[in-house]
A protein has these predicted regions:
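N-terminal flexible/basic segments that precede or flank functional cores
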Residues: 1-19, 80-87
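Alpha-helical coiled-coil heptad-repeat segments used for dimerization/assembly
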Residues: 19-22, 26, 37
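Residue-level signal for the short linker/turn that defines the boundary of a DNA-recognition helix
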Residues: 22, 32-33, 59
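Basic nucleic-acid-binding interfaces
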Residues: 29
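Short alpha-helical DNA-recognition segment
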Residues: 32-50
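DNA major-groove recognition helix of helix-turn-helix/homeodomain DNA-binding modules
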Residues: 62-78
Length: 87
């Protein structure tokens, strides 16, 4: 994952479900939110949140995006030719 750091969470190019899970877990822990609290505010089950944090490949996209939003994270999609992280 090509990345930028912000405090203790690494953000950047995501290529796998595991990358997304690592970012979600790091952001949740950085903000001091327990897994059950994050699941509740995202309206998903704790088991679901645990699965995406562990990189489950088949996690439902809509729920995953909701978790990201509730944690204050955005998703941007760029064509490879316009990748803002290329350097």
């Amino acid at each position: 994952m090509k990345s930028k750091q912000n405090a203790t969470t690494t953000y950047g190019k995501v290529t796998t479900a595991e990358d997304i899970g690592q970012i979600i877990r790091a952001k949740r822990k950085e903000t001091g939110v327990r897994q059950d609290m994050a699941a509740g505010m995202s309206e998903v089950g704790t088991k679901f949140l645990s699965q995406i944090e562990n990189g489950k490949e088949t996690a439902e996209l809509g729920k995953t995006l909701r978790v990201l939003r509730k944690l204050g994270l955005n998703v941007y999609i760029y064509p490879r030719s316009a990748d803002p992280l290329k350097g």
